[in-house]
Amino acid sequence: MSTHIEAQQGDIAETVLLPGDPLRAKYIAETFLTDVHRYNTIRNAFGYTGYYKGQAISVQASGMGIPSISIYANELIQFYGVKRLIRVGTCGGLGTDVHVRDVMIAQSASTDSAIIQNTFGAGLYYAPTADFKLLMKAYQAAQQAQIAVKVGNILSEDRFYNDEIDRQKLIQYGVLGSEMEAAALYMLAAKFNVQALAVLTISNHIITGEETSAEEREKSFNEMITVALEAGIA
């Protein structure tokens, strides 16, 4: 048992999907997994373990933002021996070549968070990147399922409401979308020598204003979940 997760040793699989929303965690477990049991209710950050195609998979809600996902990633890795962490969540789209409901695989995650400087000190700008093997498995799974995906750099922001960032410059430099967690997940995975990936769905377009409903964000986006699950099994 850790500070924020009440599971016992052996309750959590080596592969964990990390949705931010606890209701999305519940939806994933009930819709995609078999023989499911819930191992965590602390702070209503629901955690479940079940089976997908015969292999144990866990789903742990991780909250919103870098501080929250950092807590769960640290505890899953250090207390429960998790080896593969796959964030599944939403992302705001940027540019004209990405659209609402597109699936996106984050190859790398730039950030405006101070987590990089706090870790490495001033003057060193570490580049958080996904695990290549997980990324390739996710991309190949999407191709086999005929799911169109975008692969590229995203931005992990510290603020959801942020008017100061130059969005057009991000688009110019090929940043596909914006969310709030992946950079920390990738950095922590590198620190502890485990695998991490973010598979995202564009829930809204930051430039055009198009968006999906809260219910759709909670209970759909099944293509993203399928890609993540396929990447997570051996």
From Swiss-Prot:
CDD domains with a match to the protein in the record: PNP_EcPNPI-like (cd09006)
Single GO term (MF): purine-nucleoside phosphorylase activity
EC number: 2.4.2.1
Domain of life: Bacteria
Record's catalysed reaction(s): a purine D-ribonucleoside + phosphate = a purine nucleobase + alpha-D-ribose 1-phosphate; a purine 2'-deoxy-D-ribonucleoside + phosphate = a purine nucleobase + 2-deoxy-alpha-D-ribose 1-phosphate
Marked site positions, Important for catalytic activity: R217
Binding site for a purine D-ribonucleoside: H4, E179, M180, E181, S203, N204
Top-level EC class: transferase
Keywords (A to Z) from UniProt: Glycosyltransferase, Transferase
SUPFAM superfamilies: Purine and uridine phosphorylases
Assigned GO CC terms: cytosol
Positions with a binding annotation for phosphate: G20, R24, R43, R87, V88, G89, T90
Quaternary structure and partners: Homohexamer; trimer of homodimers.
NCBIfam families recorded: deoD, PRK05819.1
Function of the molecule: Catalyzes the reversible phosphorolytic breakdown of the N-glycosidic bond in the beta-(deoxy)ribonucleoside molecules, with the formation of the corresponding free purine bases and pentose-1-phosphate.
Protein name per Swiss-Prot or TrEMBL: Purine nucleoside phosphorylase DeoD-type
Species, as recorded: Latilactobacillus sakei subsp. sakei (strain 23K)
Gene encoding the protein: deoD
